[in-house]
Each structure stands twice: as C-alpha cells, then as structure tokens.
Amino acid sequence: MADVRTNIQSIDPVWEQIQDEARQAVLDEPLVGGFVHACILHHKSLEKALSYRVAAKLASNEMSMVVVREIVEEAYAAEPALVAASRADLVAIFERDPACHRLLQPILYFKGYQAIQAYRVGHYLWTQGHHDLAYFFQMRVSEIFGVDIHPAARIGRGIMIDHAHSIVIGETAVVGDNVSMLHSVTLGGTGKEEEDRHPKIGNGVL
C-alpha cells in the first residue's frame, strides 16, 4: 500500500496533499466528516472532486446536480487544460492568501475559487458553441457566489479572487496569468456598442 501511495503522490502530489488534509480534517472535526468525505475523500482525482463540488453548488430545480456534474466531467475529459488551470489557481491561493493554510480550503470553502472553476467550464462551453449552457453557468455563478463573469471573457491561470464579493468581468475582458483580485472589482464596458469594449489585465497584476 505504501508503494501505491508513493506512486500516486509522484503523479499528483497536489491531490495527495488535499486528501491528507481532508483525512486530518475529519479527525479534527468529526461533525464535518460527511461533508469532507462527499467533497474530497469519495473521489479518486481532483477533477472528480471539482466536478462534484461545482455541481453541488450550481445545481437547482432547473438543472439537476447529476446533469451539471456530467457537463463538468465531460468538459474536464475533453479539455485537460481546465484541470491544469484549477491546480494553478489552487496553488496561487495557497501561496498568496495568508488566510489559506491548506490546499483543501479553497475547494471546500472559498467562493472565489469555486466561482472561477465554474466560469472555466462555462468558458469551455462557450468556445464549443454551447452558448445557452454557458449562460446558465454564468447565471448560477452570479446567483450563488455574487460573481458575474461573462463566459466569453478570457481568464488565465493562477488566479486568486480574495473574498470574491461583487466581481464583474465583461464579455471582451482579458485577465492574464497569476492575477490577484480583491472584492468589488468591475471590468466593465467602455461604452462601445460592440467589439472590444472591456479592460485588459496583464500577467502578475494585483
């Protein structure tokens, strides 16, 4: 068993650390055991855990958790860069946010991280021509998290949105890699009626 765990860690050390943190969380706080098992320990990979978490947050009477989860899993399977970006976002938060002490925290508790992962799936759907599905994801992210990101907006990797309250990112906005945002940020339109009308944020900007 030790050899198997070593092999897993060499393949995905981020996921292995998340699982270790989840097991410790259950020992420390047994009352959250069911929640932590459902979100982390029942899953074999980060993408499976994220599929569950995003679906659990976005599901509604209009679209079931099963359907949302299938959409997310299909997106992850078709576009591995989505999961790579989710890892980069996770590490960015862990490294930059003094309130983040474990990789586990953003997946379970940080709405900024959760909102960005849902946006990434919505953006993938948009690029594949599934605009109404993408708009549904945008609507639910706005309703649940208070983060309104147009699915056509282009956002890089390693993103941290601290507190993630009242965030608006418009259709033609571009956000580079390794960007950190605080709350109440609006990348709104310039007044043009069409084409390129939103701000562009370069790499490494706070």
Predicted segments with their positions:
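Beta-solenoid/beta-rich acyl/carboxylate-transfer cores
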Residues: 146-160, 164-180, 184-186, 190-206
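Terminal amphipathic alpha-helical/low-complexity segments used for targeting or macromolecular assembly
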Residues: 1-140
